């Protein structure tokens, strides 16, 4: 299920999926190809995921905190997992601007 996926992380020509149960499984494609596959397979539900920088695709439902000075993105479900992902400062600034923009539209 989509809700079980916390994030995808690039690992060279492959990537890993990390689940809410903290299980890490390899996927035989790079992050860009995975991003296209998610769009194709999930349709409207693909918006559940957001590409952040070069290394991550994150489940937006679990974004908790954007820490630009420490270059960390905290994602959590407040129960089973909390991950602190190292993200570039520029990617975090773009994410924060996107979150602010979508919050203002509501």
Regions found by a protein language model. Give the residues of each.
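Basic, polyanion-interacting recognition surfaces, primarily
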Residues: 1-106
